[in-house]
Amino acid sequence: MPQLIPVTTARLGEHLPLLELLPDSAPVTWVRGGDGLVGWGSYATTSVSGPNRFNDARKWWHQQLEKLAISDSVHVSGTGPILFTSFSFDPSEESILVIPEIVVGMRNGSSWITWIGDQAQPKLAESAQMLEDAEYNWGDGSLSPGEWQIRVAQAIKEIESTKLEKVVLARDLKVNSHRAIDPRKILRNLSAEYPSTWIFAVNGLIGATPELLLRLSRGMVTSRVLAGTISKTGDDERDLALAASLARSSKDLEEHEYAVRSVADALDPFCTSTNVPESPFVLHLANVMHLATDVTGALIESKKSVDAFTILEKLHPSAAVCGTPTENAAKLIKDIEGMPRGRYAGPVGWLDARGDGELGIALRCGQITENELRIFAGCGIVAGSNPEKELTESNAKFAPMRSALS
């Protein structure tokens, strides 16, 4: 029988903020307001694709866990070996799974380190590395703004003439640098400007998502749904008035209801006493406001063996990133969106060996490939949508990544 590989989790004293600890060796992150997990080095990584990708991911993760001997003196969510995941939007595209060699976690002032191997506890950086600013050249994406508006108009016609109720159309922009792009400076900037979002990085996909697709913690399930958006002006009084108008907007409330319904329906078979608030709240971010609803529930006792992969298969794609009905919306996206989404709008986050974890939807993000960055934004299209307004909304959703690069 092969010898098991040791995995050790130990408490930490004071250290640099999580995002300042990262070396340049394939960083992975999931950080919100300073708390979360960061990791580096690759103990194991693989990719999955196809209709059985969530099941294939589960099998691979469990195969890796069978090779490990875990010594964990901290015993909270996020300790022990951690799987970082980034699933594609479309099953036919590649999804990535990464188990880092070293993970540092922090929650409510307590922190820990996990490392794989029989070496001594790794030493952490004691001073933040100075990262140089890069120069970027911006270009159009797969479609020009005008071409994208034409596709939005096509989608509206489809909604008005078929059973389709809502579809999410995304667009991209391409950015080039004269050298390989270092994600760490971008991640720090995103965290500073958008501390209430989840700052993620997995295999070159980096971003700041405001949308928590799934949190599993000791049998409790949470999903935050965002749909319905309005840009901020920077004037507090004006923004309060805009927030009130967003909360009354029939178009945005309709779009939001589709998204909430799709998540609640997906969770219902697994949960008892699912809580769906009657009306959404307005979530204020640095540059936009969203209608938001937190859907919560407790796993049915007989379903305690259900894991995140099972629930993700039912949750994704939700109406917030695809549409309603799902199959009709997914087909229209494939027909008219004009680009591969890759891992944009797919589940991204982490799981631990207990089955606890947090996964968001990969929004407000970009994919780094050496010296190129491709950033994404999507808009929910319903019968009352206007192509020009949707273009404006998409530009607002590009703002976090644009700002993080400046």
What are these model-derived regions, one by one?
Residues S25-R32, I82-F84, E165-V167, P195-A201:
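A short, Trp-centered hydrophobic/proline-enriched beta-strand micro-motif
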Residues S88, V202-G204, V348-D352:
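Short, solvent-exposed loop/turn elements at beta->coil junctions and helix N-caps
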